[in-house]
Amino acid sequence: LQDLMQRLLTPHRAMLPTTVNIHEILERVRSLLTAEFPGSLAVRRDYDTSLPELVGDREQLIQAVLNIARNAAQAMGGEGEIALRTRSLRQVTLAKKRYRLAMEIKVMDNGPGIPDAIRERMFYPLVSGREGGSGLGLTIAQNFIQHHHGTINCVSRPGHTVFTLNLPVEQA
C-alpha cells in the first residue's frame, strides 16, 4: 500500500520550471471552477498586482490551487463564495530557508469548515471529509507546494476556511 501511495503522489512528469505569473494561474483556476460549478458559486479575487513573476511549474501550481478550491466548492455544494487573494511577503522563512521576497496566496471560503475529525490529518493520503472522496487532493497540493520550496497551512471554522500558500519568489 505504501508503494502504491508513493506512485500516486509522485508527479507523472518531471517538474518543468518556467517563469509564471501567479495571477494567470489563479485566473485559470477561477475559470475552471466557474465552468465546473455554474450558478451560485462566486469566485472573488483580490490580487496584489505588484507581485513579480516566479519560477515554477505552471501545471503543478494550477493543480495545487485547484485541488484546494475544488474541495471548498464541493463542501459548499457549489454555492457560496471562494476568494483568491495574493500578497507579498518580505524577509520570510519557508521550509527552513530565508527569502527576501515571497508571495502569499490565500484560498478562502464561507463553507461549513473542515470537520474536527479530519482537521489534523487532512494532508494525509486517503483522508477525505466527502463521501466518495479520494483523499488525495490536499496531499497532492501539499506535495506540489513543497516542490516549489513553499508552505501550506489551513485555519478553519464553520463559515470561514483559509488555506495559505507561501511561495518564494527568488531562490534562497
Named regions from a protein language model:
Residues 13-16, 53-56, 129:
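Conserved micro-motifs of the catalytic ATP-binding
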Residues 101-102, 114-125:
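Short conserved segment of the HATPase_c
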Residues 1-39:
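Conserved DHp (HisKA) dimerization/phosphotransfer helix of two-component histidine kinases, i.e.
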Residues 137, 141:
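Short alpha-helical Gxxx[C/S/T] motif in the catalytic ATP-binding
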Residues 82, 87-105:
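Short beta-strand-loop-beta element adjacent to the nucleotide/active-site pocket used for signaling
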Residues 40-52, 87-89:
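Conserved catalytic submotifs in the C-terminal HATPase_c
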